[in-house]
């Protein structure tokens, strides 16, 4: 654990130096191909960083924050697009916006920033109890185990982002973008993926994939068809990115299952939008919000098994649980040593 932690710190220092290079050098180069060429070596470096770890948590953090977030933002920055445009005023803000899904506040007020400690504590308690439940997984049905796996991933991400949110606010006065907006209240797939679940992803995929694909498609087809192709392209890229993230976690050749999951949802979302645009539906067919929520959430839950199969099959979920317990023991041990003065 200690060696992995030291390696984690070293690589984050390297990442900060690399992003600083992009801030000072790339800003002196006009937006376009030449700026892109100047940041591509950094993007390549960020693709390699997760491979230096054997712990799933460290590899996953590197893959998520650098290989995925930072790389997409730097590529958009090369063309004066995305969250790094206009250029942040300070290097520290540039680094944080590059690595994390943050939303800078112009006039942050610490009195308005209240971390719900009680909610955080409840999530931590549930998460710890859930970790202990893995010892009894042989007694759980596959359906219940899938629910446990989904809850485990959700809670772990929530806890990590809450900690990062507090750290970023303390250092910069910036607030993190909310990771979700009550996804269980989604009334359609378009609502779920575009406005409720993992909100930072559509915020990046829109300028990086959807808009360019739609503009190119407009040359050959009408505006509605171009919009559908743009949506489908965004889901395709999202699937490819998740395949990459799963590769870093499992170190196994991608099977394409995750990509097919996103392609399925892309096709269904496009079909849903097309149906809602039809005259008959707009005039005569009204579905109550309760029914639409049940249908939407039910479809997402049923198909989510496809998304989790690679992680379950490779034992990554169990490794995440064991590493989390090991981390808790490590912190407890260090805390006791600190108290005893040894």
Curated annotation (Swiss-Prot):
Keyword Transmembrane on this protein? yes
From the UniProt record, which GO molecular function terms apply? long-chain-alcohol O-fatty-acyltransferase activity
Question: What functional role does this protein have?
Answer: Catalyzes the final step in the synthesis of long-chain linear esters (waxes).
Name the InterPro entries for this protein.
Wax_synthase (IPR044851), Wax_synthase_dom (IPR032805), Wax_synthase_Magnoliopsida (IPR017088)
Q: Which reaction does it catalyse?
A: a long chain fatty alcohol + a fatty acyl-CoA = a wax ester + CoA
UniProt topology in membrane: Multi-pass membrane protein
Ribosomal protein listed as a keyword: no
The record's keywords, sorted A to Z, are: Acyltransferase, Lipid biosynthesis, Lipid metabolism, Membrane, Transferase, Transmembrane, Transmembrane helix
Q: Which GO terms describe its cellular component?
A: membrane
The membrane spanning regions, by residue number, are: 9-29, 36-56, 58-78, 115-135, 153-173, 227-247, 255-275, 297-317
Q: What is the name of this protein?
A: Probable long-chain-alcohol O-fatty-acyltransferase 3
Location(s), subcellular? Membrane
Q: Which family does it belong to?
A: Belongs to the wax synthase family.
> What EC designation does it have?
2.3.1.75
Note the Pfam families from the entry.
MBOAT_2
A GO BP entry: lipid metabolic process
